[in-house]
């Protein structure tokens, strides 16, 4: 037997007693008796059994003090004694005595076991005090076993927080105090123990049933020992913060909970096999063990009990996780192993055998301790022969609201695939039809009874009825017939064709027919559209266009006038100067002419009764000037509507009317005296004429006078332009004009005194009268449709131009409605002017063409400029530079035209016409704002 290698570890046991320390210079020598009792150190051994060199050998000579220190810490004799005790220990439990344990520093939690229950406790890694040895207290030496017969103790580091260990020794006597971690074999039952986080010691009972309180000092975590052969595996137990005492019955064996840590292995001669205990998980204090469940689980077997114990330590899973229940019972295992994938995903019909298996599973779940849900009512299923297919429950479709169909839907409805009624019958019956709800009902093809109520609530609905007007299934056509059908189709574009009504499928056809009918209407029947021939016929009179615009509301579908009530304009407050005021309702023949006929006012006046005829008034200066111009014209009308005999009395009548003008003026309405009116009366009179309020009294009186004169002014007489005046000389006409002008002078001056400054001499009045004549001619030009060249007969005088003084508009009196000429007078004037000579127009055109030729010659014949920055006018035109009209006119008038033989001057306006005729870019020197242009 070889000598085992010994390693010495000093482990502090109980707190050392406080002893008085003496500070001496040299250590005291031991007594003589102690030195005699010490045995001699054995001789050194050779071979494998030789002792190894100690960890702290002395390098110098050994002195008495060194020997004393070695003796105080432990001599070789004590090592040999401990080793001999460890190797010669016999596993005899009856001879062992209880080992005295040091008392814990805190209050102990005792646990008592009764009866034959044997208890195995974890032994802390420490050396008990040997009662037979006489040595000083303070340190306990731990011995590590070596070889097969020794005790092997693994050192462990001290944790940060020390824990108290429970130590229960199963040996009867404690004589083997020097043994560390010894476990008594032949343990048949195991008790469940819990360990607190606080360092507490528990009381344990050995086989004899005697319990002795043990003191567990606060020390580091201890190692767990293995049980000997024949004993059951013992699991580790994790310390719980709050310890609870457990009691077990005599016939049960409960697995103890061991703390986590390293395994301490022991080897004995009688137990060569080693059993390693598994680790246990942490037990939550919220799970309280149910004794009834533990009793049921204990009968099932060790495997089930371990599984249920393990499930207590699980963290509760999340709600979205699928829990799979594994039945560990033999009954559940036998029934679960026969289940296949097809049975799990089978049809919705169940048989009675499957219902019984479900009941067995529920009962087995209750017996195995699973959570029992609330009681549910089992539904008996009818066994069917439908093959097992994974059917899906059809959802109830909501009724689609009827909405307007678009053209796209109508066009593509012929090609959409429609479901037939046969497809519904081929589908399997729904799940609700398997239930035997009612005995009466319809029989389907599959042999199921469909109750009436379930039929109404069934999710499967029939096909909707075909909508009215939907396209039928198309027939495949040949290419030729398809082309013909496409040619017959009518495509309508626009916003009105985006939606088609469901109740009228022929909407597109009707709409297209209506459009074609509207396009086929005769343009000549449309009153708003005039044919080219009619436009050419009516181009001579402006009144034709006015009639077509303003009288269109009173015409029927054929363009004829509607017989409506004629409004009498005699007593209206607002004057109508463009119509002859009628004293009474005229005849229908005069008011409703034919469609293409035109009645002259002169003829109507002759045919009217004498009571309704308008008295002939004196001709004004404008009419006299026009007649004078026409009388001096050499050309005579080719076709005169009346002969000389009929015209002579008219001339006499006109001559007499000029003389009788003065007495007839007194017959007009008398103007009221507005000076005598009060201010409120003047305001009311102004409101009658639709004017705003005026604060000044004088302005109100002047305005009322002007309004009265404009309203009560007699209608203008008919022009006598068509009748040439031969018997009347130019002197007589001039005298008449002079007399009429002298008669008009006081009226003009009196009307101007209200607002403008009074005229100083007759020359100014004559110039104003001439300007008025010119303005009236301009009005005639704008109102008639004759070309402007027929009105303007300017004579270019080479001596110079006579500047005509323009009278500003502010000098003229402001009237509420300026006097207008009647339509018939405008027509007569236009006819008279058309008959005027055209000789002057030809002369002007020839003169203008000659001027343009001289302008062209003057520009092109000018020598080219030597300065590139200042080119000539011809070069500017060729370079497309804009030509300033004022500059070019000044250059031409300063000698350029004289060089080419033209004595006169050219105006910028005439020069602009020449530039436009030659397509030359030209512009004015002044811009639109009135200032000179900075750049061109």
From Swiss-Prot:
Biased region (Basic and acidic residues) positions are: 110-121, 145-157, 202-227, 273-284
Q: Name one GO biological process term.
A: DNA repair
Q: Where is this region: Disordered?
A: 1-182, 195-291, 303-338, 437-472, 631-671, 734-829
Write out the entry's keywords from A to Z.
Answer: DNA damage, DNA recombination, DNA repair, Nucleus, Phosphoprotein
Can you say where in the cell this protein is located? Answer: Nucleus
Ranges annotated as biased composition (Low complexity): 63-76
Its chief place of residence is nucleus
User: Example GO molecular function term?
Assistant: 5'-flap endonuclease activity
Biological role stated in the UniProt entry: Regulatory subunit of the slx1-slx4 structure-specific endonuclease that resolves DNA secondary structures generated during DNA repair and recombination. Has endonuclease activity towards branched DNA substrates, introducing single-strand cuts in duplex DNA close to junctions with ss-DNA.
Quaternary assembly: Forms a heterodimer with slx1.
What this protein is called in its record is Structure-specific endonuclease subunit slx4
């Amino acid at each position: 037997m070889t000598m085992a290698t010994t390693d010495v570890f000093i482990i502090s046991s109980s707190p050392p007693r406080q002893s008085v320390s003496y500070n001496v210079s040299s250590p005291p020598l031991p007594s003589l008796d102690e030195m005699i009792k010490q045995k001699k150190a054995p001789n050194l051994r050779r071979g494998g059994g030789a002792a190894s060199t100690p960890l702290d050998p002395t390098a110098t000579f050994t002195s008495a003090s060194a020997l004393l220190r070695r003796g105080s810490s432990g001599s070789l004799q004590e090592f040999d004694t401990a080793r001999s005790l460890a190797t010669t220990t016999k596993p005899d439990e009856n001879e062992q005595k209880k080992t005295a344990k040091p008392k814990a520093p805190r209050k102990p939690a005792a646990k008592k076991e009764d009866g034959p229950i044997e208890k195995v406790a974890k032994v802390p890694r420490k050396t008990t005090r040997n009662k037979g040895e006489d040595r000083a207290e303070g340190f306990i030496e731990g011995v590590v076993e070596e070889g097969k017969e020794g005790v092997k103790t693994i050192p462990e580091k001290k944790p940060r927080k020390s824990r108290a260990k429970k130590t229960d020794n199963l040996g009867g006597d404690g004589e083997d105090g020097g043994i560390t971690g010894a476990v008594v074999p032949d343990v048949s039952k195991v008790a469940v123990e819990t360990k607190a986080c606080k360092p507490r010691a528990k009381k344990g009972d050995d086989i004899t049933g005697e319990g002795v309180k043990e003191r567990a000092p606060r020390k580091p975590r201890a190692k767990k020992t293995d049980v000997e052969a024949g004993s059951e595996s013992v699991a580790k137990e994790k310390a719980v913060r709050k310890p609870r005492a457990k009691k077990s019955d005599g016939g049960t064996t409960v697995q103890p909970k061991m703390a986590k840590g390293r395994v301490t292995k022991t080897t004995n001669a009688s137990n060569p096999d080693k059993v390693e205990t598994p680790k246990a998980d942490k037990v939550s204090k919220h799970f309280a063990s149910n004794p009834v469940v533990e009793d049921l689980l204990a009968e099932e077997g060790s495997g089930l009990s371990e599984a249920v114990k393990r499930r207590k330590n699980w963290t509760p899973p999340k709600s979205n996780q699928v829990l799979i229940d594994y039945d560990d019972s033999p009954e559940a295992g036998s029934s679960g192993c026969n289940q296949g994938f097809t049975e799990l995903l089978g049809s919705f019909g169940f048989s009675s055998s499957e219902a019984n298996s479900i009941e067995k599973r529920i009962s087995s779940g209750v017996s195995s301790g699973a959570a029992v849900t609330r009681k549910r009512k089992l539904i008996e299923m009818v066994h069917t022969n439908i093959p097992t297919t994974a059917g899906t429950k059809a959802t109830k479709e909501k009724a689609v609201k009827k909405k307007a169909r678009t053209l796209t839907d109508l066009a593509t409805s012929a090609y959409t695939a429609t479901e037939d009624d046969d497809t519904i019958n081929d589908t399997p019956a729904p799940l609700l039809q398997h239930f035997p709800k009612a005995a009466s009902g319809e029989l389907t093809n599959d042999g199921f009874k469909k109750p009436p109520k379930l039929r109404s609530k069934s999710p499967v609905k029939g096909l909707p009825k075909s909508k009215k007007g939907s396209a039928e299934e198309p027939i495949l056509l040949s290419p030729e017939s398809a082309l013909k059908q496409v040619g017959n189709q009518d495509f309508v574009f626009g916003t009105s064709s985006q939606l088609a009504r469901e109740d009228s499928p022929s909407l597109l056809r009707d709409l297209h027919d209506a459009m074609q009918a509207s396009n086929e209407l005769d343009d000549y029947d449309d009153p708003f559209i005039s044919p080219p021939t009619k436009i050419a016929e009516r181009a001579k009179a402006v009144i034709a266009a006015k009639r077509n615009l303003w009288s269109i509301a009173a015409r029927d579908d054929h363009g004829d006038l509607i017989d409506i009530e004629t409004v009498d304009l005699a007593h209206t407050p607002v004057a109508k100067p463009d119509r002859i005021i009628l004293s009474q309702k005229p005849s229908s023949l005069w008011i409703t002419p034919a469609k293409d006929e035109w009645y002259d006012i002169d003829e109507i006046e002759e045919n009217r009764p004498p009571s309704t005829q308008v008295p002939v008034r004196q001709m004004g200066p404008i009419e006299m000037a026009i007649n004078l111009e026409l009388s001096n014209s050499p050309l005579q009308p080719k076709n005169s509507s009346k002969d000389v005999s009929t015209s002579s009395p008219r001339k006499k009548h006109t001559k007499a009317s000029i003389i009788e003008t003065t007495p007839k003026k007194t017959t007009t309405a008398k103007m009221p005296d507005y000076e005598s009116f009060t201010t409120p009366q003047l305001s009311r009179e102004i409101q009658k004429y639709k004017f705003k309020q005026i604060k000044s009294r004088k302005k109100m009186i002047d305005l009322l006078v002007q309004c009265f004169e404009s309203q009560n002014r007699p209608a203008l007489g008919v022009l006598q332009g068509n009748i040439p005046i031969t018997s009347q000389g130019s002197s007589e006409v001039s005298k008449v004009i002079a007399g009429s002008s002298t008669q008009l002078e006081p009226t003009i001056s009196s009307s101007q005194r209200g607002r403008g400054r009074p005229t100083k001499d007759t020359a100014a009045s004559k110039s104003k009268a001439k300007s008025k004549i010119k303005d009236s001619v301009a009005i005639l030009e704008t109102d008639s449709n004759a070309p402007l060249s027929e009105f303007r007969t300017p004579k270019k005088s080479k001596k110079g131009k006579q500047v005509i003084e323009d009278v500003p508009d502010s000098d003229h009196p402001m009237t509420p409605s300026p006097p207008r000429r009647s339509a018939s007078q405008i027509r007569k004037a236009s006819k008279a002017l058309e008959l005027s000579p055209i000789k002057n127009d030809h002369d002007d055109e020839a003169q203008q063409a000659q001027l343009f030729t001289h302008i062209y010659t003057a520009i092109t014949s000018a020598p080219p400029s030597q300065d590139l920055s200042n080119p000539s006018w011809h070069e500017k035109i060729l370079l497309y530079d804009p030509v300033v009209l004022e500059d070019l006119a000044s250059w031409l008038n300063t000698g350029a035209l004289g060089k080419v033989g033209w004595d006169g001057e050219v105006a910028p306006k005439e020069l602009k016409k020449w530039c436009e005729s030659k397509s030359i870019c030209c512009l004015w020197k002044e811009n639109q704002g009135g200032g000179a242009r900075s750049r061109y």
